[in-house]
């Protein structure tokens, strides 16, 4: 079964690249480019991890995490602060060995 990943960032272009990479690696990944949209997605379905992009920082990052964890308290957290090329690495670290497919 694919692990479900909720990705949150600011840039749709970067988000699209990250989603392609995660899906190619076997994850069921969905993305949002606003905090409200990410929270709405978390409320609609269970996710194994929340991947937060480097564009969401400071108080916005704290708000996103707080709101998502209020809905899904056991969600794993991963932070792709180094750009899209780090997303897969940090996600695998947060989840363990990665997707099981």
What positions do the PLM features span?
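Conserved acidic segment of CheY-like receiver
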Residues: 2-11, 18, 50
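Structural motif
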Residues: 8-12, 53-55, 80-82
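Alpha-helical interaction/dimerization surfaces of two-component signaling modules
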Residues: 21-22
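Short hydrophobic/Thr-rich beta-strand motif most characteristic of the beta2 strand and flanking loop
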Residues: 26-33
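Acidic, metal-coordinating helix/loop segments flanking the phosphotransfer/catalytic sites
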Residues: 33-47
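Conserved N-terminal glycine/acidic-rich loop preference
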Residues: 35-36, 55, 87-91
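Conserved phosphotransfer microenvironments
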Residues: 52-67
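Ser/Thr/Gly-rich flexible loops in soluble cytosolic domains mediating phosphotransfer, phosphorylation
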Residues: 70-101
């Amino acid at each position: 079964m694919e692990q479900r990943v909720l990705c949150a960032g600011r840039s749709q272009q970067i988000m699209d690249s990250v989603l392609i990479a995660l899906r190619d690696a076997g994850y069921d990944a969905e993305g949002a480019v606003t905090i409200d949209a990410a929270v709405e997605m978390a409320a609609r379905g269970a996710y194994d991890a929340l991947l937060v992009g480097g564009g969401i920082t400071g108080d916005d990052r704290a708000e996103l995490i707080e709101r998502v964890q209020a809905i899904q308290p056991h969600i794993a957290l991963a932070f792709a602060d180094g750009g899209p090329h780090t997303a897969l690495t940090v996600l695998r670290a947060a989840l363990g060995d990665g997707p099981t497919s």
